[in-house]
Amino acid sequence: MGFRKILASKSHHSRHHNQHHKNLKLQNHRYVLISNITGSHETKYLSPFRMDNCSGSRRRDRLHVKLKSLRNKIHKQLHPNCRFDDATKTSDDKCVSYEVPERDGLATISLEEVFPKSNRCQIPEENLGETDSVIHRDLGNFANENDYPQWRKVESQYNLENVQPEEDEIVDRLRSEIRSTKLKSVKTTSRTLEKAIEARCTGKRVLQQLSCQSNQLTKIESNCDMLKIQSNVADRKIDELAHENRSLLALKSPNPFRKKREREKRDQIYNLKLKHRHLQQETMKRAQDSDKNLAINLSSEYGRYGQGVERQRILRDAQKYQFEADEEDNQMEIDLYGNLEQIKAVSGDLKIMAHAFGREFEAQNTRMFDIENNVQQADNALQAKRYRLEKVIGKRW
């Protein structure tokens, strides 16, 4: 049987009012008694929560704390299937527990093993009447050390001397936690490295697609340049056709004053060739710039770490993160360092590719805008030449 907090007042201090104790409210009473029922009568011990500074109260408080620690040791360490009986019982009269349901399969540890009858401190008979008005404040002094509760017998019976966790257990637990944390870190960095390498491969594919797209734009620009040149040639051919299609009555003798006009025509043809060459150079320059944007320096291979001098340096730097390091722990540190270094290298490659993407996107957007303008101008010129050619062919004399 165990200690039980019972409210004490002028009319409620006896063990014969258990049912009425259930209905009392704790917040309406200031003083609390902890009761233990002996063989023939009730023995009361003051609660450690009382507002008293006497030496007897402090001694009882220490006993209460030590007893509570002993109960927890028995319950948690050695007897997980045992519990203290919260009922207030005597050898003459058996009382039910205070709203504590019985649990099957659990043994009950009696506090008689801790407090034998011969060592229980009883309330002096001359002070029994004080409990009718106030809480009894002094339950007598212990005569000697043998009057203290005999929990030494219980410690020896339940072997509680060495229930504290051993230093080796603490070390093993710390080593296990460190090892599990490092394993998680290695796995996490490995997964991160895999995702980074996948992103790097995707970036390479995008670079290849941009390179193919740049080649297509180069071909389109070359065709636009040829369209401009052929448009100028068409103008010259239409002029010749108009000259040959002149009236029959027109003079056909050579004009000695046309040398200047012929010279201008030759200059026009020469300028047309220069323009063609200039357009081709611009097209090639754009293609080269595109290739230069896409020709980035990436880390083709990532070295293996943990060999020779590099291994010693890694292990020397990792000593502050290790606890009783062994070969497995050293290997985890090397793997972790290698994963982080590779992630760093791949991240640098991704950054370089991102900048290359930005430059190439801007360049290709500019090229496509120029292609659109050139095609629009060539279409307008083609419509004008068609109208002029129809006018020359349909001319009547």
From Swiss-Prot:
SMART domains for the chain: t_SNARE (SM00397)
Renumbered residue ranges of the record's region Disordered: 1-26
Listed GO MF terms: phosphatidic acid binding; phosphatidylinositol-4,5-bisphosphate binding; SNAP receptor activity; syntaxin binding
Gene3D superfamilies, per database record: 1.20.5.110
Region (Positive regulatory region): 51-95
Effect of K68E: Strong decrease of the sporulation rate and loss of lipid binding
Region feature Inhibitory region, mapped onto this chain: 4-50
GO BP of this protein: ascospore-type prospore assembly; exocytosis; Golgi vesicle fusion to target membrane; intracellular protein transport; sporulation; vesicle fusion
Domain notes: The inhibitory region sequesters the protein in the nucleus.
Entry's family note: Belongs to the SNAP-25 family.
Binding partners and assembly: Interacts with the t-SNARE SSO1 and the v-SNARE SNC2.
Protein name: Sporulation-specific protein 20
Species for this entry: Saccharomyces cerevisiae (strain ATCC 204508 / S288c) (Baker's yeast)
Gene: SPO20
